[in-house]
Amino acid sequence: MPDVKKRKIAHEAPEHGSDAESTSSHESVAQQDDTAETQDEAAATETRPAPKSFKDLGIIDQLCEACETMGYKAPTPIQAESIPLALQGRDLIGLAETGSGKTAAFALPILQALMEKPQSFFGLILAPTRELAFQISKSFESLGSTINVRCAVIVGGMDMVSQSIALGKKPHIIVATPGRLLDHLENTKGFSLRTLKYLVMDEADRLLDMDFGPLLDKILKVLPRERRTFLFSATMSSKVESLQRASLSNPLRVSVSSNKYQTVSTLLQSYLFLPHKHKDIYLVYLLNEFVGQSAIIFTRTVHETQRISFLLRSLGFGAIPLHGQLSQSARLGALGKFRSRSRDILVATDVAARGLDIPSVDVVLNFDLPTDSKTYVHRVGRTARAGKSGVAISFVTQYDVEIWLRIEGALGKKLKEYELEKDEVMVLAERVGEAQRQAIVEMKNFDEKRGTKAKKFGKGKRSRDEMDQEEG
């Protein structure tokens, strides 16, 4: 593997008991190792001094320079807790929300180990959605730019032959969705992961929520037992616990979130109580109030995502849809346009709630409330990131009161009602009504195209490619 520049690395991360601070923070871990073969737990605490740089964590200068180039000024809590333990060769369970910097938390130790012993098929990262897989690959390539790391993205919706060619070039890192990876393991001649050194399951709770469990079992059976495994998840459900027992060896658990429903202090959250029949009018009014700012509008269904996109476009807004039934190229194109601000409004199902690399969103509008509090937190977490301020407004109709009260209960606080003048809103009624009629015509054409496609490919059990995309 001549492309990776090999050099001898002395890990600077302290071993257990090598200094006073490390010993005190991990004392219970050592005790658990002595008494039973249970998983260790290393909870992040505010009492330990935060490392000032990635070098403090044991990351070599070459990778530290890459961090600086990417704008990583100081380690995030999940990076500060995970990286030293990963450099010690431990299996890890990382409990952290999206936007916490967890990709670098597993990418940096893997890249550092790759520099010590370069080989093909060194690391495998499994992700629940295609977009997240491309994002992770981009992070690996950026962090590993100085060592010429080669990555292959293996996801559904893309050409199998070109992916087989990419695998034939023996990349260092594979980032994949489970369905398409299993297709290649079963059907691509000469492709094997018998020499794999690192496995990462990112957003494991979503992998299991999307029924990837049986596919993960098949993948795990063909991987070598002698490997390092990192499992990252926003929550620790019973399914995730079962997965970690089946795939990890005496892992350390790192948790950086004391409250799974916690939102950042720079996020201004409110709700808008309104009649269901007037939701479109209120939406247009709010977008006029936030004109010039980037916004994500969350809906519950593909149909509503498309309808609102058509509605807003007819009114002159730069809106673009994002949902799981778009082609892969269309989804990546939508994200690219939104990131570049050539379109400033993204209308999306919950495919955009977690894991996507959208660095700057000013406003989140929950046009349709999510059915659970966890999804609400992930949605509003798309704004007010990296210390910036943000606004999240949720539409609460007469049919949503019970759901909204559950969300407020999970947050542990009552949110303020967004104040506006109803008379000013209803001035837009006639204009929005015309746009609604136009959107109905466009939706009819859209649904006819979808129906033709469904008949062409037939109905029945979801294919692995369909499982490789977010529901909705």
UniProtKB/Swiss-Prot annotation:
Keywords: ATP-binding, Helicase, Hydrolase, Nucleotide-binding, Nucleus, Ribosome biogenesis, RNA-binding, rRNA processing. The keyword DNA damage does not apply. Its main location: nucleus. SMART domains: DEXDc (SM00487), HELICc (SM00490). It is found in: Nucleus. GO terms for cellular component: cytosol; nucleus. GO terms for biological process: rRNA processing. SUPFAM superfamilies: P-loop containing nucleoside triphosphate hydrolases. Residues 20-29 have a biased composition (Polar residues). Its EC number is 3.6.4.13. One of its GO terms (molecular function) is ATP binding. A motif (DEAD box) lies at residues 202-205. It catalyses: ATP + H2O = ADP + phosphate + H(+). Residues 10-19 have a biased composition (Basic and acidic residues). ATP binds at residues 96-103. Gene3D superfamilies: P-loop containing nucleotide triphosphate hydrolases. Residues 282-426 form the Helicase C-terminal domain. Residues 452-462 have a biased composition (Basic residues). Residues 83-254 form the Helicase ATP-binding domain. A motif (Q motif) lies at residues 52-80. Residues 1-51, 451-472 are annotated as: Disordered. Belongs to the DEAD box helicase family. DDX47/RRP3 subfamily. The Q motif is unique to and characteristic of the DEAD box family of RNA helicases and controls ATP binding and hydrolysis. Interacts with the SSU processome. ATP-dependent rRNA helicase required for pre-ribosomal RNA processing. Involved in the maturation of the 35S-pre-rRNA and to its cleavage to mature 18S rRNA. This is ATP-dependent rRNA helicase rrp3. It comes from Neosartorya fischeri (strain ATCC 1020 / DSM 3700 / CBS 544.65 / FGSC A1164 / JCM 1740 / NRRL 181 / WB 181).
